[in-house]
Amino acid sequence: KAQPIGDLFRGDVKRITILSLIVCACSLTAWWAFLFWNQQHFRNLAIDAGLDVKSRERLVSAAFFLVIGVSIPGNFFAGYLAKIFGYSRAIVIMFIGFFASMAFTFFIPRSYIELLYWAPAIGFFSGVFALFTMYLPPLFPTLLRTTGAGFCFNIGRISAAFGTVFFGLFSQVGDFRQALFYASFLFIPAIICAVLLPEPKDLKQ
């Protein structure tokens, strides 16, 4: 039987819940903002470069699948880090890489050709999300594991949906680079909260 949501905000569990919510909300919002606005950014750069409609749509599709494809080895790398350092530290390391690669990619204006080289690094560090399904449930007491992990992750997804639109409003008309750059800073609170979260006993080697 699923436990009441209110139990997540009582006693010692409250701290875990709040930290987990911030980790999920901030990291997922940054990632979803990247997935959505990066495509628009590529499309605009292709228009500025004079590519025809067919060519720029091929470019946008190629860029998207390149990022997603690189995330697969990123998943294995995240698992490798977790095996060596533990899940908590692995998530922190991957978040740092996520922030650095995303901030550096969009810190200055780049051509679509340059972005094809830089954007995959962001996709690689998105492999951190492969750790969430193993890491989040054991943070909570046994009877609250399903409720706690599901609640935090789903609230994170809802936040990501609103956050993606919010960061788009930051951008100047036709310039999504700023929105993507600002979104990268969401990994800073995610990193801080991930540092404060414990390594679950069930996952300790």
Question: What positions do the PLM features span?
Answer:
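Interfacial helix-cap and linker-helix signal at transmembrane-aqueous boundaries
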Residues: 42-43, 81-82, 167-175
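Helix-to-loop junctions at the C-terminal end of transmembrane segments
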Residues: 74-86
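Cytoplasmic membrane-interface "Motif A"-like loop-to-helix N-cap segments
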Residues: 83-95
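C-terminal ends and interior cores of transmembrane alpha-helices
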Residues: 96-110
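Hydrophobic core of transmembrane alpha-helices in multi-pass small-molecule transporters
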Residues: 113-127
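A late C-terminal transmembrane helix in Major Facilitator Superfamily
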Residues: 142-171
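Multi-pass alpha-helical transporter architecture, strongest
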Residues: 185-205
